């Protein structure tokens, strides 16, 4: 039903499907919202390795230790997002643990842009930022290796001096269903319903009721995009 919602929402907006397609998208996402899933109280708990079969997850790609050890392939591609493996000793000597500055199996090839990190940190109340990325301006920075920004949401586990990329990867979460519901209702002109569903997600993130209040269709769509990003 999540995929069905996305398809009919896309059909309505891009292929001229109109309200008929929106109606199908609406009934599809409503079925998801009534299926017994529940948002976890804390965003970080969604990605906890000890809590991967939780009530918020609709569909995930599961990984376990040693499931795939081929360099450069899933799930090992997460190593590209972490600190260079060659810096592990230097980081430890500087007093940083594997949890604070996780290192991968080779160089850090993927670095989130400063603009994206700034976007995620626009509101200091957003509890998702530190769970998703880390930005460093610490003493371990050198001219040779600049570890400034890294994605840490799927860093896996660390044991016996080895990092295993065993974090499950969510394809669909309940929070996304609420955002799809908000997008569908906004497209149908149901402003109150759109804001209600949008603010369910925002409430957990910012700890504020009715975080979004702007009622124009464009403003709501832009808010939905911000929450997705």
Which ranges hold each PLM region?
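Acidic/polar-rich alpha-helix caps and helix-coil junctions
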Residues: 1-75, 121-229
């Amino acid at each position: 039903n999540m995929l069905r919602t996305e398809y009919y929402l896309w059909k309505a907006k891009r292929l001229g499907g109109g309200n008929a397609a929106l109606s199908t998208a609406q009934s599809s996402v409503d079925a998801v919202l009534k299926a017994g899933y529940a948002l976890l109280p804390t965003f970080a708990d969604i990605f906890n390795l000890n809590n991967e079969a939780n009530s918020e997850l609709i569909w995930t790609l599961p990984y376990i230790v040693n499931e795939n050890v081929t360099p450069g392939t899933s799930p090992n591609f997460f190593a590209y997002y972490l600190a260079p493996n060659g810096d592990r000793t230097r980081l430890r000597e500087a007093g940083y643990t594997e949890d604070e500055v996780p290192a991968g199996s080779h160089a850090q090839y993927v670095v989130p842009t400063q603009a994206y990190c700034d976007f995620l940190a626009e509101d200091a109340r957003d509890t998702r930022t530190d769970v998703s990325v880390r930005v460093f301006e610490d003493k371990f920075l050198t001219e040779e290796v600049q570890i400034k920004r890294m994605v840490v949401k799927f860093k896996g586990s660390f044991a016996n001096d080895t990092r295993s990329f065993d974090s499950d990867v969510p394809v669909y979460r309940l929070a996304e269903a609420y955002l799809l519901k908000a997008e569908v209702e906004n497209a149908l002109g149901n402003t109150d319903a759109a804001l209600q569903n949008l603010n369910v997600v925002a409430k957990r993130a910012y700890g504020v009721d009715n975080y979004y209040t702007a009622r124009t269709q464009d403003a709501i769509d832009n808010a939905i995009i911000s929450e997705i990003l």
